[in-house]
């Protein structure tokens, strides 16, 4: 399949939106502004986490950031209903987590190993969630979350509680080559489950370029092989991403089976903060996909008259205050006591000493 100038390419082709059509959709304004504020907060939070990691101290393990992927992630997150839908985010989905409704204090507590966090200090950083609420903790084995979220949807169907619930999970270009990804997507397609898969094609699976990962022209081609509906979108264009995910979630909820959204973008940093990404050529960094999606979104907001320079500055200041406040709280909270803890990371409903249910 050949790339087009349109920000959105649909397979099978049900509609194609051009940039002007997307930009003049006033009904996207509320979602756009919510997503943009989530992106700003996410970037501010991740800059703080990166700084704490480099300084050494309480953050144990790796720090994985979503710089460059915020627009794609947040656009999915604003469509996922907290406490109703099922969400299984991946390592670069901080913007999506915020848009979904996760308090940033949960993130900071987990990174600092506080016993008050959702993982109670037993599992760290990106491996956090509240499964009893439909918020799945990330699994390091890439592709596995596709089956987990699909299985959770199938379980609700069997129990008669599915209703208009949708499930969503994320994966990168490299993860789409795993067996778990294919098994999960195949099951979801056969059962016509309301699953939306966000594929962040950030050009590298750690240090392996896409030219060494797959031979199809666009990863969205893989959706067709399973009978799923697929969309290829400019992952740096917030307006296009919002319009695409809005449609994908609507079709999933309406019974059209799994939807796969592929975002074309670039990871603006290393695999983690330990990685200098020196293997990424400058020629790729300067391509269209290398644009900073937050700067693109700010320009869109100003051009459309949806926000002013003062608004943007205010949101950035508010984000800094919120992040600083979360750090101040979590920094004073204790780590788990190894002599008194059960080390059951996901027993989040049993924070009272002595309860082991």
PLM regions: where:
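Conserved acidic/glycine
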Residues: 1-72, 269-357
């Amino acid at each position: 399949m050949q790339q087009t100038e349109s920000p959105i390419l649909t397979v099978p082709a049900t509609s194609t939106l051009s940039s002007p059509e997307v930009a003049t959709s006033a009904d996207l304004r509320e979602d756009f502004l919510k997503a943009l504020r989530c992106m700003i907060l996410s970037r501010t939070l991740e800059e703080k986490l990166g700084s704490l990691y480099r300084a050494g101290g309480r953050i144990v393990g790796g720090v994985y950031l979503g710089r460059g992927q915020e627009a794609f992630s947040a656009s999915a997150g604003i469509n996922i209903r907290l406490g109703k839908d099922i969400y299984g985010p991946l390592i670069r989905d901080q913007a999506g987590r915020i848009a979904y409704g996760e308090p940033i204090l949960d993130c900071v507590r987990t990174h600092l190993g506080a016993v008050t966090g959702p993982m109670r200090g037993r599992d760290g950083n990106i491996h956090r969630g509240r499964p009893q609420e439909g918020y799945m903790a990330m699994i390091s084995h890439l592709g596995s979350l596709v089956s987990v979220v699909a299985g959770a949807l199938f379980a609700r169907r069997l129990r008669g509680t599915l209703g208009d619930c949708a499930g969503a999970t994320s994966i990168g270009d490299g993860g789409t080559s795993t067996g778990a990804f294919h098994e999960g997507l195949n099951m979801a397609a056969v059962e016509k489950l309301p699953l939306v898969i966000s594929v962040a094609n950030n050009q590298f699976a750690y240090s392996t370029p896409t030219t060494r990962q797959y031979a199809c022209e666009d990863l969205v081609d893989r959706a067709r092989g399973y009978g799923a509906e697929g969309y290829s979108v400019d992952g740096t264009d917030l307006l296009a991403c919002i319009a695409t995910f809005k449609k994908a979630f609507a079709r999933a909820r309406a019974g059209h089976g799994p939807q796969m959204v592929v975002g074309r973008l670039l990871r603006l940093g290393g695999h983690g903060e330990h990685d200098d990404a020196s293997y990424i050529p400058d020629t790729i960094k300067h391509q269209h996909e290398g644009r900073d999606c937050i700067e693109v979104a700010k320009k869109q907001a100003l051009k459309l008259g949806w926000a002013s320079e003062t608004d943007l500055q205010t949101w950035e200041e508010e984000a800094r205050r919120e992040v600083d406040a979360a750090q101040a709280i979590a920094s004073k909270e204790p780590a788990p006591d190894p002599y008194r803890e059960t080390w059951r990371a996901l027993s989040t409903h049993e924070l009272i000493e002595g309860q082991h249910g």
